[in-house]
């Protein structure tokens, strides 16, 4: 899955070519590239180096200020994100998208989402959830990566809006024992006070609802031209949904869950009660 910057750059390259009235075959022939390379650059499947972008802009007749803007975007798309230090334990495509998101919607019917987990709570989940036999060092490595992810919600520059909907069972499911669970609830209480974080609880009394099919995450971006992405993971691995119809269904589902859930104020009170039990 291309990063947001890569998708944005790909869209600009595609639009410039079309504005120039050129086919992919024509551009490929002029540059001595394959048509497949042009196609991959225009979908973000392959990274476009600033050098390649400059060559394409020459052919398309793109001049400043658009030229400078797109070349700067190409350079930014090549920059290493913090997650590149954890590629051995993290899904780089997901964290790259998460890092660029302006809004993260997380339906969490089983456990507290990773962005809000305490280290001890996260360690218990990492240990219990591994089908492979990982040693302590590998588990700690994954834990470090998860804690590093959390810095996006506290950063001073453009932190995303995080909207979490928890199933009520998450508040009482013992992960690692009473003390770890209690500390996690206290952490949730603190996080609900951040202006960019909203936590709602879906009461057990809600009965049958659209979220019973499983957890999912919605990622929305600041620029309207950047389409939303939905994400889910499990034993099957990870699944990214970019098809507009499917993403719309996820958006509708999240909105229905939001309407069914307790208000943020009622939810905070319920979490505080769970923290004291």
Predicted regions and their residues:
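C-terminal regulatory/effector modules of DNA-binding transcriptional regulators
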Residues: 177-277
């Amino acid at each position: 899955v291309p990063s947001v910057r890569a998708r944005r750059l790909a869209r600009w390259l595609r639009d410039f070519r079309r504005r120039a009235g050129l086919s992919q075959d024509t551009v490929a022939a002029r540059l001595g590239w394959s048509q497949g390379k042009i196609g991959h650059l225009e979908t973000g499947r392959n990274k476009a180096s600033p050098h390649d972008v400059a060559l394409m802009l020459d052919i398309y007749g793109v001049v400043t200020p658009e030229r400078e803007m797109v070349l700067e975007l190409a350079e930014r798309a090549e920059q290493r994100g913090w997650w590149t230090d954890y590629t051995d334990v993290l899904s780089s495509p997901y964290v790259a998208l998460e890092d660029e998101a302006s809004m993260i919607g997380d339906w969490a019917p089983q456990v507290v989402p990773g962005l809000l987990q305490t280290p001890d709570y996260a360690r218990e989940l990492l240990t219990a959830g591994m089908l492979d036999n990982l040693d302590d060092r590998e588990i700690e490595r994954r834990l470090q990566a998860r804690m590093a992810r959390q810095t996006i919600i506290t950063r001073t520059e453009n932190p995303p809006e995080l909207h979490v909907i928890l199933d009520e069972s998450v508040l009482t499911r013992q992960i690692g024992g009473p003390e770890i669970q209690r500390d996690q609830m206290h952490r949730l209480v603190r996080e609900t006070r951040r202006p960019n974080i909203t936590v709602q609880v879906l009461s057990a009394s809600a009965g049958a609802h659209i979220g019973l099919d499983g957890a999912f995450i919605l990622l929305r971006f600041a620029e309207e031209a950047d389409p939303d992405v939905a994400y889910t993971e499990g034993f099957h691995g990870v699944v990214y949904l970019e098809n507009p119809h499917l993403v719309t269904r996820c958006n509708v589902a999240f909105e229905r869950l939001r309407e069914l859930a307790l208000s943020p104020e009622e939810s905070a009170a319920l979490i505080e009660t769970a923290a004291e039990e």
